[in-house]
Amino acid sequence: MSIESHLLLENINAEAVDASFSYGTKQPGAGYYRLNNPLHTAVYTVNAFNGTIKIQGTLAMYPRDIDWFDIEGTTIGDDSTIMGGETVTPVLFSRNFTGNFIWIRAAYNLQDGTIVSIRYNY
């Protein structure tokens, strides 16, 4: 049963000029509250999306750039496939991941389309 739900990104449609990633604002993970259930679920809502999105975590209470790491199994997209098609109807993808992460954030490289939202709960 989820306890908390957080919004990581919303209405992103600025396209990247290169292969570098942009980052959303950090949000608390299960480890922040010292919860015993480290299961998280991320839901990605995209529309005509071409790019890459992944979730990053950290075990540091006051993280620096080098403290963040990619959470395995959370990546969608590969910079070459349009996800969500060319329709006006957004498409949802979900990924489960476990860990007592203190902070969670979204990393993204948007080549085209829209990231409608990325939400996660634990």
Predicted regions and their residues:
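Structural beta-strand segments of beta-rich domains
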Residues: 38-42
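Transition segment at domain starts
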Residues: 1-36
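Intrinsically disordered, low-complexity peptide-like regions
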Residues: 4, 9-11, 16, 65-68, ...
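Short, surface-exposed beta-strand/strand-loop-strand elements in extracellular ectodomains
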Residues: 50-70, 117-121
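Beta-sandwich interaction modules
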Residues: 26-37, 69-122
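Short proline/glycine-enriched turn/loop motifs at strand-loop junctions of beta-rich domains
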Residues: 47-52, 111
